[in-house]
Amino acid sequence: MATQTDLAQPKLDMTKEEKERLKYLQFVQAAAVEALLRFALIYAKAKDKSGPLKPGVESVEGAVKTVVGPVYEKYHDVPVEVLKYMDQKVDMSVTELDRRVPPVVKQVSAQAISAAQIAPIVARALASEVRRAGVVETASGMAKSVYSKYEPAAKELYANYEPKAEQCAVSAWKKLNQLPLFPRLAQVAVPTAAFCSEKYNDTVVKAAEKGYRVTSYMPLVPTERISKIFAEEKAETEPLEFHPLD
C-alpha cells in the first residue's frame, strides 16, 4: 500500500519541474535542443557514409571525448543556469513594466477586450444590414466609413514610421553582412526580393487605377530609395584595396 509520503511525491516532483521550467525563454531552450538533435543526425549519417575513413573518424571521436568529456561534465550546466538567470530578469522586467504602465493604457487594453467580446453582436447587426440593403451596398458603406475615419491616422503613422524602418533595415543589413556566408546568400535573395517588390508595386498601382480604394492603405515600396541607401551603405563598408608599388 502506498504511504501518504509516496502519494505526495509526484506533487513535489511536479512543483520542482514547474520551478525548473523557463517562463519566457523556453523557446530558446527548445531551439537549442532541436539544433543539437539535427546536428547529431547529420553527424551520424556522415560517419556512416565515410567508408574507409570511418575507423579514423571513430578514433578522433574517441580522443575528443577523452579530452572534452571532463570539461563538459564540469560546465555543461552553465548555459542552462545563465538562461534561467536571464529568464528571471525578463520576468522582473515584465512585472516592473506592468507596475509602471499608466492606467490609461490598461484602460485602452480593457476596451479592446470589451470590443472583442461584443464582436458577435456587431456581426449580427451587420448580417441584418446585409439582408436589408444587400451585400454590395453594405460593403460599400462600411468601406467608405472605415476609409474616412482611418485614412488620416494611417497616413500619419506611416509617414512617422517609414524613416525609422529604413534606419533599422540598414542597421540590420550591416550586422548581417558581418556574418559568414551571409553576403553570398544575399546575392541570391536580394534580386528575388527586388522582383517581388516591383510586382507588388505594379499590382497596387493597377488596383488603384481600377478604383479599389483599399489600395490607399497599401503604400508603394520605395525601391529606388532603398537601392540608393544600401548602395551608399555598401560603399561605406567596402574594404580599401591596396596595390603594391611598382
Curated annotation (Swiss-Prot):
Pfam family, one: REF
Keywords: Acetylation
GO biological process: developmental vegetative growth; lipid droplet organization; lipid storage; positive regulation of growth; positive regulation of response to water deprivation
PTM annotation (N-acetylalanine): residues: A2
InterPro entries, sorted: REF
SS bonds (residue pairs): none
CC annotations in GO: lipid droplet; plant-type vacuole
Family recorded in the similarity comment: Belongs to the REF/SRPP family.
Protein name per its UniProtKB record: REF/SRPP-like protein At3g05500
